[in-house]
Amino acid sequence: DNREARALWETQGIAVGQVGNKQPVVACLFPGQGSQYPGMLREIIAACPQASLLKEQMNQSLLKMGHPTFEDIIDNHEQTLGKDVFRTQLSMLLADTLVFKILQEMGLRADRLTGHSYGEFSALHAADAFQFENAVQATLFRCKSIEEAPIEGGLVSCAAGEDVVAAACASFPEDVFVANCNSPQQTVVGGEDRSLRRFVEFIQSEGIRTTTLDVPRPFHTPLMKPAQKPFKRALVSV
């Protein structure tokens, strides 16, 4: 029932609707790592038969490829979300894909598709550039390239604009980099864990609020460079 599904979407912060008579241009932005949480979409799957069917179809593909199922990943019994890179990124591919396909069944027709960070893999699948199995395989290659490279660190969100945060990074005596500019009042920085902890103290002393993101690497910073070449080589086979 679409009305029941729409009510559940709204509890998740997802709005579905149309304003006015003119058909709008519809853009879908797929979230990436850091948006995951245990039990994602549990209520929607329980209430929506189409969602349950899609989940089972994804499970069949995952099992054939030797990977854990949707439930194994999302229920997070092993406390791996946010720590295990592959399970965390795969959780976002599964959730992004399921939500997008259900919205399509509800009548959504997207004119533009894009992804935030890892969300580009979900966007590529939604655009049919990747089949589901290819998206999973590319995710695995991406994660192996990251995990096998000598990279440690994380990300911190700062409640300030890029100019302010970039200036703070420049005046800080250790390597901390601007990683994402999410909005005029939210900028994400990345670095090694020890440097990030000191940077948080430094920027908080300037009256700027911070949030440590649930990610295991300093994504979108120069520190990720060792993972680039191995990933590029692996993508050739996808």
Regions found by a protein language model. Give the residues of each.
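Short, low-complexity connector segments at domain boundaries
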Residues: D1-E43, Q79, T97-K101, E105, ...
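Compositionally biased, intrinsically disordered low-complexity regions
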Residues: A15, V19-K22, P68, D84, ...
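Active-site machinery of serine-nucleophile hydrolases
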Residues: V25, L29-D75, L90
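Acyltransferase
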Residues: L53-E56, M65, I74-V238
